[in-house]
Structure formats: C-alpha cells, structure tokens
Amino acid sequence: MATRRRSFPLVPLLLFLLAAAAYGRLISDGSPASASATSLLSNPVSAVIRLTTSNSASASSPPAAAPEEKCEQSYGFLPCTTTVLGNLFLVLAYGFLMYKAATFLSAGSELLLEIMGPGLVGGLLLPILGALPDALLVLVSGLSGSRETAQSQVLIGMGLLAGSTVFLLTLLWGTCVVVGKCDIGPNGVAVDLQNNKGFSLTGTGISTDVQTSYAARIMGISVIPFIIAQFPKMLKTHHGQRLAVLLALIVSFSLVLAYCLYQVFQPWIQKRKLAYAKHKHVISGILRHAQMEALGRLLNEDGTPNEDVIKKLFHKIDMDESQTLSRAELHALIIGINFEEVDFDKNDAVDKIMDDFDTSGNDIVEEAEFVSGMKRWLNEAKRSVPTSGAYSNKFITDYHARTRQEHDLLVDRSDETVESVENPGWCITKAVGLLLLGSAIAAAFADPLVDAVHNFSNASHIPSFFISFIALPLATNSSEAVSAIIFASRKKLRTSSLTFSEVYGGVTMNNTLCLGVFLALIYIRNLTWDFSSEVLIILLVCVIMGLFTSFRTTFPLWTCLVAYMLYPLSLVVVYILDFVFGWS
C-alpha cells in the first residue's frame, strides 16, 4: 500500500511570509505618559500594537511625524503590503491562481468541444473563453479608482496586451519550432518523425499546411484597430483622438464577430476545399495515366501542350470509335486509373470531368473539347508545380504527388468528427463546472493581481508596463503554451499545423477581443490614449512574423533565432522610446 505524502502546511507559510514584511509599533491614546514603558506596564489598555508596513519610522521618532504608506485591501480582506518582497509574493500567488483559471477554462472548453463538436461551440464560444483571463485583466486595470488612478493602472492592461502578443509570436513560436523540428527533405518539406540531422539550422525545421498560412494572414489583419487608434498620434495631432478610439473599438469587435463566424463556417469551407482537392487529384491521375501508357510527352520542351499526344489519348479512351467520349467511357477511364486508395465518388468525378470538357452541353465530349480541356488542365499543373525550365515526365509525377498531399491534408481535417462519449450528461456537467470555476477564479483575482502589480511597481520603482509585459502573459498563457509545445513535439506536419494555427488564433483574439475591451475602457472612462511605443512593438512583431508566416509553409531551424531575438528587441525599443526619447 502506498504511503501518503505529507504536504507542507501552506497556511502557516503564508502567514509567516506576510508577517515577515511587517513590524509592530506602539500607538498611544495621545497622553505623554502613554508613550513610556512605565505607563504601558501600569496601563496596558491605553496602548495597542498596530502592524505597519512603513519602513520610514523609527523607535525614537514620534508617531505623528512618521509618514505612512498605505495599501488598500482587495474586497476588504485579501492581504496587501507596500514592500517589494511582499508584493512579489502576491504577484506570484495571484498569478498562479490566474494560471489555474486559464487551465480550468481550457480543460472545460476542450471537453465541451469533444461532446458538442464544432460549429457554434467551437467557433464562437471557445475563442472567447480562451481570451477571457486576458480580457478580464485588461478590464480591471482601469475599471476602479479615480480617473488619475485608472490612467496610471491602465498601463498594466496595455503591458499585458503587448506582452501576450509578443510572447506567443516569439518565445512560444520559436520553442515550437525547436521541439517540432524534423529533417527537411529534397522537396523542401519536413519529413514526419525523421530527425537525423541534429540541430542543423538549414537542414531541419517544421512544415505546416496552407490553411495555417491563412490563419497567419488573418492575424496580420487583426492589427488594423491598433493603426486606427494610433492614427492621430501618427499625424501628431490631438484632434479626433477620441473619435479614433471609438472607431477602433467598433472595428475590433467587428473583427471578433467576423473571426468567430469564420470559425463557425469553417467546416463547410473545408468540405468545399476537400472536393476541389479530389477533383485536382483526378486531373493529375489522368495526366499521369497518359504518360504511363507511353503515348508520349504531354508537354513540349517549351512547356506548350503537345496536341498530338492529347489526341492519341482521346482515341485510346474512345473505345467505340465514335469520335466522342461518353460518360461510360470516362467512367471506365476513372476505374482503370490507380488512385492510390483515395476514396471518392467515381460518378461525381465523371460529372466534374464532363463539366470541364463538355462546353457544348450535349453530354458528350468531342475531340476538340477534349484537347481544349486537357490544355487547361496542363496549364493548371504548370502553375501548381515549380519547374527548373525543362518540362520532363517527372513534372506530371510531381504534380500528381502534390495533389495527393493536398488531398491527404484536407482528409485529415475532415475526419475530425465528434466521437460518442460515455455518459454525456455527466461530461457536460463537468465541462460547465470547469468553465464556471475558471471564470469565477479569473473574475475574482484579476483585480487583486492588477493591484499587486501596481504596488510592486511602486515599491521597486520598475515601470508597471515591464512587469505586466513579462509576468502576466506567463500566468495567462502558460496552459496553452505547455499544450502547444507538447503537441508540436510529436514532429508531424499535421500537429505542427494545428499548433501554429492555435498560436495565430490566440494572437488574433488578443488583437481584437482584448484590445476591444481595452479601447472600451479608454473611451468610457475618457482616458488618454498615449501608448505609441507599446503599439509600435505590437505592430513590429505582428507584421514581421505575419509576413514571414503568411507566404511560406516550411520554417528551417534558424527561423527560431529570429523569433527569439524579437522578444528582447521589443523591450529595448520600448525602453529607448519611453525613457530616452520621452514618447510616453
């Protein structure tokens, strides 16, 4: 029988740490006698002990002359302090609670998605729940207190916004490349599960599918609200700043809605893309079949279609020598071609071929129509496959292999169906419970965490932006970061694509939903928009990484160095602009 491990008592430790930052001093009733030790001994009721966190008072100085630093307890009972170590402890404690809140929200969201499947749940609810901890921290950073206090604390919210975006696109992105790297093959694509080249900066890396590039482009579009809000500052004018904030606010939430709707209807988009990929694979199969039958080269040396070979293929398919191709003859052609276990409806394939070739609408394909259609197919193949100038027989083989790869990637996505779960009622209850628990923890401790960061900034004289930029994203994004790293370590194109899509999706929600909450706070409380350096680093990182990831699908190992360097560069840029050039 396993012995139970005794845990260290947590409550005494907390009390000890809190008490270590304080000391006692005598508070008199105002009479001179009460200040002496004799009076204290003779009249113990006339003096009491008060705990204070002020370090400026001394034992010999009168109480009235000692300046007091005060801290305000959150909800009237949570601990507070004005010391550096005390506030550091509170930042770590509240940050850990926000991490647990994010973990509960993530677990509940995944469980709910497993039960109910994609659609409204996966497309609308889950992206919002994933961004909830960050959104709450941004909201409470300027919600309470006077306008001056809110203007001071709202910098914490901007630090979290910038820090989360930069963290995801630099440290997390680079780490996923490192743990997910595979050997890059001769075709420039990472080979699944093959990692024999060590840490070669150019010979290893990761590959993603084209849909991941689309997610990166959406992420790039999500910076538009930042540009709108910053536009008056770019023109060096104070006129229209409030209008710019309102316009950016509207655009932010419009982008959130558009992104969620895109997520909702993505299954239909995937089905449409899958049908198109199957059709392209049929085209490439017919082209390859023509070459395998030794009818000749379909393309001349200069890349133009070889009409003589195309006509030979037509007459070979025309079994009854009627000078036309019927549906039955096209169906026989499809059956005779080995499509390497690609599952599709052959009648549907015949329909699509007929649609491509039968321009006259008489439900048969004449020789001229066949030649014209084959030319279109060959031109499509030439656009899809890069060549070195010479169009050899290998060109058609490469095109067929590429269409097969596109088909397989989309089949993987279309196979993401909802599996039946045991006891769905209990699973739904558990999922809702996790979501409520995570939301409650995030809502309860967001404000104390912001206060602790603000107090730590005052005590340590470190700007609150840098604290929130570095520390808060670790608290709110650690759960997703660990999951992303574990998923990327499976070293497959499929898992890498899903991992980086999630990263880009997280940045998109930061730049839309969380920014929208921040802009609403600025507008409603009539705060000043003065975040030029912060907006600059967000634009810098998003534009560089967005352009970098939008137009390529393979990333060698050296690209992680670029991502890693952007993180300290962002901090240096903010420091120089704010404290050297005085932007803020």
UniProtKB/Swiss-Prot annotation:
Subcellular location: Cell membrane
CDD domains membership: EFh
Keywords: Antiport, Calcium, Calcium transport, Cell membrane, Ion transport, Membrane, Metal-binding, Repeat, Sodium, Sodium transport, Stress response, Transmembrane, Transmembrane helix, Transport
Spans traversing the lipid bilayer: 77-97, 120-140, 154-174, 215-235, 245-265, 426-446, 466-486, 504-524, 531-551, 561-581
PROSITE patterns tied to this protein: EF_HAND_1, EF_HAND_2
Domain called EF-hand: residue spans: 305-340, 345-380
InterPro entries referenced in this protein's UniProt entry, alphabetically: CaH_exchang, EF-hand-dom_pair, EF_Hand_1_Ca_BS, EF_hand_dom, NaCa_Exmemb, NCX_ion-bd_dom_sf
Chain sites annotated for binding Ca(2+) 1: 318, 320, 322, 324, 329
Binding-site residues for Ca(2+) 2, renumbered to this chain: 358, 360, 362, 369
Gene Ontology MF terms: calcium ion binding; calcium:proton antiporter activity
One GO cellular component term: plasma membrane
Entry similarity comment: Belongs to the Ca(2+):cation antiporter (CaCA) (TC 2.A.19) family.
PANTHER family xrefs: SODIUM_CALCIUM EXCHANGER NCL1, VACUOLAR CALCIUM ION TRANSPORTER
Function: May function as a sodium/calcium exchanger (NCX) and participate in the maintenance of calcium homeostasis. May play a role abiotic stress responses.
Protein name: Sodium/calcium exchanger NCL1
Source organism per UniProt: Oryza sativa subsp. japonica
Organism placement in taxonomy: Eukaryota, Viridiplantae, Streptophyta, Embryophyta, Tracheophyta
Gene this protein is translated from: NCL1
